[in-house]
């Protein structure tokens, strides 16, 4: 059975059981900074399990794209390890529970996948008698085929929050796959028993003290790895031998000029290339971009590891983008976003390949220098910390370092390397642990929301509202009141204040009541329909139950709205000028300015920036009507409305439509028509990472003031010339030409003076052991000046050894020269290195000429004295 059939059968089966089929969420988790990647099918539904959001439907089924990288070094070397994989799952949010989950799983596996009941084994949590009863008495699984396992394997929990026992379905692959032990069973890791489906029964809430409380609304979270079950149904020894991978691996083999199945080294390389290319293709499509931190570092590491395996098969030219094109061709029907973003994805991969080729060459050069130095020191082992530096700084895999080292007769301190790697992983683990799955504050606010109910936002319609203060928080705890000058968080039944979100900053304003005045410093929405106002008491004191009038500052709200609508115009203009591959990668909308990050492969030319700016201003001049509509997510997508990959939307979405010019899903505040924006001015465009550009801009009076400041600067620039703005470029050009001519005249005079000075130095030449020796300081000379001085000396002397020094702008330079007739005895590189060392520097070079730098100008005279001893010693 092909993977496509398995995927379709699974989704259709659960649809027949009343589940809604949802498309896979992005690999980049929506609104969850604690997670780098969507690593499990339940991740998109975490808010429903934690109670942070209310689901539109209670039964859902998905085939979720997942990415995990903890065991990256195992990929390609084992039958089951992957970075990217697809997870089939069915979920219940307070609807059905164990009986349905278990019986449906058994029905699907045995009747729809056709796996023999005799090959199936079950695990349950140690004391989950309810699950045992269902498996044994309802489904009919013999008791000897049901194994009870402990908390480590069969209980799901991640810190504070919902949790529960697990039950797993295993397939017996046959005794020939086992260890031969009479005790071999599902708990054995020999590989005979393969887990294909994990059923998680979410029935408890774990608090900070480790106590477990039964949940009123229980949940189901199941996961079946598509690649694993495909390997079982297709009767192949590993996931890599399924139709999911073979087409990609065969194509990669064709590009690389090798064959799969004949050589273990080749097979491992092809598996790594296929797996990693799938991962980077899907991740980049979903908005991740190669960089040196976070998700970007993972992408870069995977790409470089795949390239390294290609290099081991003698491929130095970029090729992963070709393999990625095959991934898109194979998976594009199931995941249409792959085809929609294909041009962008493939270009990013190719650019990164070319970039790494340069980095790889730098690493090779560093490794060669390192081995040469170690040889001079009589050592034949590359220290672990230096091997790690090659890996960490240059992306140089340890396997490649070992391979090159062995060719040159070196070994690598692998233990030292592993220690450095483990230290890095330890730091990463600690960093991850600092961000809890569900923090104490999250749990506190969730409980508070359950007590208080939802907060209604009315800020789209009005800027002020009278309501009641229903809670006050200070230092993470509920309090009854706040006194003058105190800060805290206020919760009201209704609010017109827009909370920070979607790149837009929060509203500012005041909360007024009988005997008190609060300044609103910030507004946030930590949970769905739950808004907090961070305030400072300016006058009086405030307590829970007080009546209050919430007043949004209209000026800052309108300025923010102008900038937010302008970002929508800018987004559309970018697509029109640069191409449809452009997508929003981030934004910041404040009352003062806007910042828009977008995906693009290269810098935007001045000409294109002008076009983009013109398109936005033309849309402003047309005074297009800004309309707000509500529709379903499916209808919005069908209508071509722009949606962001890393945002999570409910079934009902808010569409901001600007005439016929633009339509985007957005929850922010906007102007009523584009004419209100007034004027749009781009401040600049820059790179913020591989494949991501940033534009900063101003609107309205801010843009006008900026243009006026430019006019003021131009006016000051014209004053010395007494000319118009139009005449200024020519005047400046003429001035620069005159200055260049004067510079040439000055340079010529300086060379004449230097020549005279250098010739005068020849009077200080002394003779040691028949060699003419000269050491001197050339005042104000940089390295170029020292080279010119040396040319004069060289033309005037024979049988010489020379050491010159210069200090310019606090920087020390040395140059040593040896007559070529004497290079068998004296070495300029040795001499200059010895001198530079005294001045706190270093350098070297050829036997006849070498140069170096120093850090301490006060040591220059002392450094020059080494020449006499050097010549005398030879």
Swiss-Prot record:
UniProt GO MF annotations: alanine-tRNA ligase activity; aminoacyl-tRNA deacylase activity; ATP binding; catalytic activity, acting on a protein; transferase activity; tRNA binding; zinc ion binding
Positions contributing to Zn(2+) binding: 564, 568, 666, 670
BP terms from Gene Ontology: alanyl-tRNA aminoacylation
Record text on cofactor binding: Binds 1 zinc ion per subunit.
PROSITE patterns: AA_TRNA_LIGASE_II_ALA
Domain of life, per lineage: Bacteria
EC number of the protein: 6.1.1.7
Compartment(s): Cytoplasm
Keyword annotations of the record: Aminoacyl-tRNA synthetase, ATP-binding, Cytoplasm, Ligase, Metal-binding, Nucleotide-binding, Protein biosynthesis, RNA-binding, tRNA-binding, Zinc
Gene3D superfamilies on file: 2.40.30.130, 3.10.310.40, 3.30.54.20, 6.10.250.550, Bira Bifunctional Protein, Domain 2 (3.30.930.10), Threonyl-trna Synthetase, Chain A, domain 2 (3.30.980.10)
GO cellular component, one term: cytosol
Keyword Ribonucleoprotein: no
Catalysed reactions, semicolon-separated: tRNA(Ala) + L-alanine + ATP = L-alanyl-tRNA(Ala) + AMP + diphosphate
InterPro entries the UniProt entry points to: aa-tRNA-synth_II/BPL/LPL, Ala-tRNA-lgiase_IIc, Ala-tRNA-ligase_IIc_anticod-bd, Ala-tRNA-synth_IIc_core, Ala-tRNA-synth_IIc_N, Ala-tRNA_ligase, Ala_tRNA_ligase_euk/bac, DHHA1_dom
Co-factor requirement: Zn(2+)
Principal location class: cytoplasm
PANTHER family noted in UniProt: ALANINE--TRNA LIGASE, CYTOPLASMIC, ALANYL-TRNA SYNTHETASE
Primary role: Catalyzes the attachment of alanine to tRNA(Ala) in a two-step reaction: alanine is first activated by ATP to form Ala-AMP and then transferred to the acceptor end of tRNA(Ala). Also edits incorrectly charged Ser-tRNA(Ala) and Gly-tRNA(Ala) via its editing domain.
Family affiliation: Belongs to the class-II aminoacyl-tRNA synthetase family.
Swiss-Prot/TrEMBL domain comment: Consists of three domains; the N-terminal catalytic domain, the editing domain and the C-terminal C-Ala domain. The editing domain removes incorrectly charged amino acids, while the C-Ala domain, along with tRNA(Ala), serves as a bridge to cooperatively bring together the editing and aminoacylation centers thus stimulating deacylation of misacylated tRNAs.
Protein's name in the database: Alanine--tRNA ligase
Originating organism: Carboxydothermus hydrogenoformans (strain ATCC BAA-161 / DSM 6008 / Z-2901)
């Amino acid at each position: 059975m092909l993977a496509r059939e398995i995927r379709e059968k699974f989704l259709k089966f659960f649809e027949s059981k009343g589940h809604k089929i949802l498309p896979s969420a992005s690999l980049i988790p929506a609104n969850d900074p604690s997670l780098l990647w969507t690593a499990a099918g339940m991740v998109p539904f975490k808010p429903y399990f934690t109670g942070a959001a209310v689901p539109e439907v209670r039964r859902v089924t998905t085939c979720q794209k997942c990415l995990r990288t903890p065991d990256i070094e195992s990929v390609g070397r084992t039958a089951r390890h992957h970075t990217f994989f697809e997870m089939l799952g069915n979920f219940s949010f307070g609807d059905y529970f164990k009986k349905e989950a278990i019986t449906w799983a058994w029905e699907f596996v045995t009747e729809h996948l056709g796996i023999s009941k005799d090959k199936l084994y079950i695990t349950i949590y140690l004391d989950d008698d309810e699950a045992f009863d269902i498996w044994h008495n309802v489904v009919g699984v013999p008791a000897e085929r049901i194994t009870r396992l402990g908390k480590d394997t069969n209980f799901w929990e991640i810190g504070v929050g919902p949790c529960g026992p697990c039950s797993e379905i295993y397939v017996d692959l046959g005794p020939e796959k086992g260890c031969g032990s009479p005790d071999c069973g599902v708990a054995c890791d020999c590989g005979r028993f393969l887990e294909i489906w994990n059923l998680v029964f979410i029935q408890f809430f774990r608090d900070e003290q480790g106590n477990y409380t039964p949940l009123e609304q229980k949940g189901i979270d199941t996961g079946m790895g598509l690649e694993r079950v495909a390997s079982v149904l297709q009767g192949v020894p590993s996931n890599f031998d399924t139709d999911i991978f073979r087409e990609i691996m065969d194509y990669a083999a064709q590009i690389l000029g090798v064959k799969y199945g004949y050589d273990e080294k080749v097979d491992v390389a092809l598996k790594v290339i296929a797996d990693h290319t799938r991962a980077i293709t899907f991740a980049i499509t979903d908005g991740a971009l190669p960089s040196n931190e976070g998700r970007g570092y993972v992408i870069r590491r995977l790409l470089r590891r795949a390239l390294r395996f290609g290099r081991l098969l003698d491929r130095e030219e970029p090729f992963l983008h070709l393999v990625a094109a095959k991934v898109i061709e194979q998976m594009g029907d199931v995941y249409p976003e792959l085809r929609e973003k294909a041009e962008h994805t493939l270009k990013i991969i190719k650019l990164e390949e070319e970039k790494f080729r340069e980095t790889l060459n730098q690493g090779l050069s560093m490794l060669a220098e390192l081995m040469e130095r170690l040889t001079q020191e009589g050592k034949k082992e590359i220290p672990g910390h230096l091997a790690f530096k090659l890996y960490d700084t240059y992306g140089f895999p340890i396997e490649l370092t070992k391979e090159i080292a062995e060719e040159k007769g070196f070994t690598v301190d692998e233990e030292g390397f592993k220690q450095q790697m483990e230290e890095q992983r330890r730091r990463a683990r600690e960093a991850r642990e600092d961000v809890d799955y569900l923090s104490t504050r999250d749990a506190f606010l969730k409980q508070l929301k359950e007590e208080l109910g939802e907060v209604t936002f009315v800020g789209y319609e009005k800027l002020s509202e009278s309501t009641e203060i229903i809670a006050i928080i200070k230092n993470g705890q509920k309090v009854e009141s706040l006194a003058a000058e105190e800060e805290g968080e206020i919760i009201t039944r209704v609010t017109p204040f827009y909370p920070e979100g979607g790149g837009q900053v929060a509203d500012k304003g005041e909360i007024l009541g009988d005997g008190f005045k609060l300044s609103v410093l910030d507004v946030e929405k930590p949970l769905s329909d739950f808004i907090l106002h961070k305030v400072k008491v300016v006058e009086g004191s405030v307590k829970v139950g007080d009546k209050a009038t919430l007043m949004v500052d209209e000026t800052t709200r309108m300025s923010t709205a102008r900038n937010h609508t302008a970002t929508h115009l800018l987004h559309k203009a970018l697509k029109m000028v640069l191409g449809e591959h452009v997508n929003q990668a981030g934004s910041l909308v404040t009352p003062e300015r806007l910042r828009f990050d977008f995906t693009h492969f290269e810098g935007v030319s001045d000409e294109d920036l002008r076009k983009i700016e013109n398109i936005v201003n033309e849309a402003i001049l047309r005074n297009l009507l800004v309309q707000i509509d509500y529709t379903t997510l499916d209808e919005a997508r069908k209508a071509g409305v722009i949606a962001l990959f890393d945002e999570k939307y409910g079934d009902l979405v808010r569409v901001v439509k600007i005439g016929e010019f633009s339509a985007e899903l957005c929850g922010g505040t906007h102007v009523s028509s584009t004419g209100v924006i007034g004027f749009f001015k781009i401040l600049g465009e820059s790179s913020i990472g591989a494949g991501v550009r940033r534009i900063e801009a101003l609107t309205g009076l801010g843009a006008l003031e900026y243009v006026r400041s430019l006019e003021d600067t131009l006016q000051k620039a014209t004053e010395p010339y007494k000319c118009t703005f139009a005449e200024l470029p020519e005047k400046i050009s003429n001035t620069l030409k005159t200055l260049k001519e004067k510079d040439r005249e000055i340079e010529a005079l300086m060379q004449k003076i230097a020549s005279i000075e250098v010739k005068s130095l020849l009077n200080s030449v002394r003779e040691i052991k028949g060699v003419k020796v000269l050491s001197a300081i050339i005042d104000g000379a940089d390295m170029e000046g020292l080279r010119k001085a040396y040319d004069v000396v060289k033309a005037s002397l024979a049988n010489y050894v020379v050491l010159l020094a210069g200090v310019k702008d606090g920087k020390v330079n040395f140059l040593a020269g040896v007559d070529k007739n004497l290079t068998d005895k004296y070495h300029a590189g040795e001499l200059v290195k010895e001198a530079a060392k005294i001045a706190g520097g270093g350098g070297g070079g050829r036997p006849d000429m070498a140069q170096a730098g120093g850090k301490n100008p006060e040591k220059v005279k002392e450094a020059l004295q080494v020449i006499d001893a050097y010549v005398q010693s030879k």
